Amino acid sequence: MPPRVILIGPPGAGKSSVGKSLARLLAADFVDTDSVIATQENQSISEIFVDKGETYFREKEIEVLLNQINIHSGVLSLGGGAPLSDVAQSAIKKSGSTVVFLDVTLAGAAPRVGFNRDRPLLLGNPRAQWQELMNVRRPIYESLAHHHVLTDKLTPNEAAAQIVTLLA
């Protein structure tokens, strides 16, 4: 059975926090693909980027995504870049899962992300990098999503409750 809900969105949108709250409300299991990768690799995502490179990480991300879509039936949170490849987009669409785009503005993301070293794609000028990522990713997120939730002014519990309403 495929995931009931797949959460997608940029860094700082609250995919992990909202996902945990949503899973509680739905009495479902929660899986975060970044956490699965970090556990499998015994390294943080930023360490994987530094030690093994982005290409390795993206390959691992696809592997974990394809596996979790096949074995997980609860709430699945994807890393911000996970839906970018054609393979990932196809798998997400074919899963039959409800996809929710958790959106956030730059102003909303900044205090959550902190634009620190733990976000490997946001090094250098993190605000400009984040905006550039969103310019590329937003059309993909929007094309995959059945629902869109702006999380700027919502707590994780409020965003999760809004998703439950959308699912009804």
Segments (PLM) and residue ranges:
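NTP-dependent small-molecule kinase module
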Residues: 2, 21, 25, 98, ...
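Hydrophobic anchor at the beta1->P-loop junction of P-loop NTPases
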Residues: 7
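P-loop (Walker A) phosphate-binding loop of NTP-binding proteins
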Residues: 10
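Conserved lysine of the Walker
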Residues: 15
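Hydrophobic positions on the alpha1 helix immediately C-terminal to the Walker A/P-loop
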Residues: 18
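ATP-dependent small-molecule kinase phosphotransfer cores
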Residues: 32-93, 119, 127, 131
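Short glycine-rich anion-binding loops that position phosphate/pyrophosphate groups of nucleotides
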Residues: 80-83, 105-107, 154
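A glycine- and Lys/Arg-enriched "phosphate-lid" helix/loop adjacent to the NTP-binding pocket
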Residues: 94-139
